[in-house]
């Protein structure tokens, strides 16, 4: 059962939303963190925590606040005080609960804590990787998700080099070292796609080392290119009847079910990517034209996708009846506190897998938002829809990419009229 809407409280008396007894309120507002407890109460309310859960967290922080007052009074709280408090617990469960509650307190009132400064020696490559990240962003112009993968590749290369050649400077890096590192990475890669990505990431990192002056030579040319046939395998996809059955199996009886049905319908009827779905804001839906604005996609350009009537109705139902009442601009929100936008692709993938299995669909190794994207593309091509129309819907800049997704025949590609260089038809 959902909590009733919160009445209006001033920021200095938010505790009254959760507690009513004067003695309890007085105890909560005393101690080392007493002056921050109303802010903390507002924090839990803003994040959509249920009342019972918020009261538990507030009580845990209050117990620590009383303990800290005996050690440091109203002075900033040092890590030693926290460690001493956690040492009073004899079992893991209450200790874990206290750690979680204190994490919220630190987030709300960081000025009340003295955070130990980590040793610069803890990560000798931190500055180098930060510079590499800046290079990928400013020089290469790459998106955050792409940078994340390449940074991981650079980190793995450095870890290998530090482990195999401890104490050596990167200037000592040789072609033999590079080939050995590549061989090591390829031995850990199971598919042609991951092997190609691994060598590409190493190549990019080595170019950066030369560009930034960390090595006198560009050793990227040493990295061998791995064969990768993009059209060698059919992309995983479902029969459209299976997709339809999974959607119909979702009963719109709970807020979670209403949200999940809207998620599956939007993915299945527009072919948008996982990250694109998570980035949709309420203001991105044009209800008059029946369209959704998709921001700066994988192809680095915005696009618009059409809303089918059924999908639009599901979104309306979700917004009016199920969407948590929190201050967030994003369309789809997690129901697990802290309530807010999905922070990664994993929750959306779990929703897709759960609902497909519930609908009796047999799943292979790949089962996420992209499975529905492949399925829609295959369905559209099977209906003889123009390939360029499918490419526009999916946000592909090249029809060749659409061919990769849907495995179309060369004869169908030939039907597409390509523009003549210079603008003539």
UniProtKB/Swiss-Prot annotation:
GO biological process terms on file: DNA integration; DNA recombination; establishment of integrated proviral latency; symbiont entry into host cell; viral genome integration into host DNA
Signal peptide positions (record): none
Domain of life where this protein originates: Bacteria
Transmembrane segments: none
Annotated CDD domains: INT_RitA_C_like (cd01188)
Active-site residues from the entry: 273, 298, 370, 373, 396, 405 (o-(3'-phospho-dna)-tyrosine intermediate)
Domain Tyr recombinase: 233-418
Gene Ontology terms, MF aspect: DNA binding
Keywords associated with the record: DNA integration, DNA recombination, DNA-binding, Plasmid, Transposable element, Viral genome integration, Virus entry into host cell
Family: Belongs to the 'phage' integrase family.
Name listed for the protein in its UniProt record: Putative integrase/recombinase y4rF
């Amino acid at each position: 059962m959902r909590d009733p809407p919160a009445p209006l409280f001033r920021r200095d008396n938010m505790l009254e939303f959760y507690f009513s007894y004067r003695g309890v309120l007085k105890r909560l507002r005393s101690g080392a963190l007493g002056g921050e407890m109303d802010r903390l109460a507002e924090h839990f309310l803003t994040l959509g925590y249920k009342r019972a859960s918020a009261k538990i967290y507030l009580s845990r922080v209050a117990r620590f606040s009383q303990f800290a007052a005996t050690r440091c009074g109203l002075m900033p709280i040092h890590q030693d005080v926290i460690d001493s408090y956690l040492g009073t617990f004899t079992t893991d469960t209450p200790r874990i609960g206290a750690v979680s509650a204190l994490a919220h307190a630190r987030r709300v009132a960081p000025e009340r804590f003295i955070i130990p400064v980590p040793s610069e020696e803890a990560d000798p490559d931190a500055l180098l990787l930060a510079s590499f990240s800046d290079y990928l962003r400013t020089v290469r112009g790459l998106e955050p998700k792409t940078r994340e993968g390449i940074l991981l590749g650079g980190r793995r290369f450095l870890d290998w080099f530090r482990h195999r050649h401890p104490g050596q400077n990167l200037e000592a890096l040789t072609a033999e070292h590079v080939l050995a590192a590549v061989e090591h990475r390829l031995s850990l890669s199971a598919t042609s796609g991951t092997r190609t990505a691994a060598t590409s990431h190493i190549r990019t990192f080595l170019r950066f080392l030369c560009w930034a002056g960390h090595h006198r030579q560009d050793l990227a040319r040493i990295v061998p290119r791995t064969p990768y046939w993009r059209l060698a395998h059919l992309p995983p996809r479902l029969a459209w009847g299976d997709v339809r059955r999974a959607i119909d199996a979702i009963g719109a009886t709970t807020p979670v079910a209403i949200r999940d049905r809207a998620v599956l319908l939007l993915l299945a009827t527009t072919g948008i990517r996982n990250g694109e779905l998570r980035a949709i804001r309420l203001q991105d839906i044009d209800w008059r034209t029946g369209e959704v604005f998709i921001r700066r996609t994988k192809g680095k350009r915005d696009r618009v996708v059409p809303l089918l009537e059924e999908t639009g109705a599901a979104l309306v139902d979700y917004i009016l009846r199920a969407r948590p009442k929190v201050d967030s601009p994003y369309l789809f929100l997690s129901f697990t506190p802290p309530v807010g936008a999905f922070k990664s692709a994993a929750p959306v993938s779990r929703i897709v897998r759960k609902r497909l299995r519930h609908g009796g669909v047999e799943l292979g190794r790949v089962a996420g938002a992209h499975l529905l994207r492949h399925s829609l593309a295959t369905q559209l091509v099977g209906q003889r829809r123009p390939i360029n129309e499918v490419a526009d819907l999916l946000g592909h800049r090249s029809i060749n990419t659409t061919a990769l997704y849907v495995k179309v025949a060369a004869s169908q590609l030939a039907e597409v009229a390509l523009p003549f260089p210079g603008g003539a038809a």
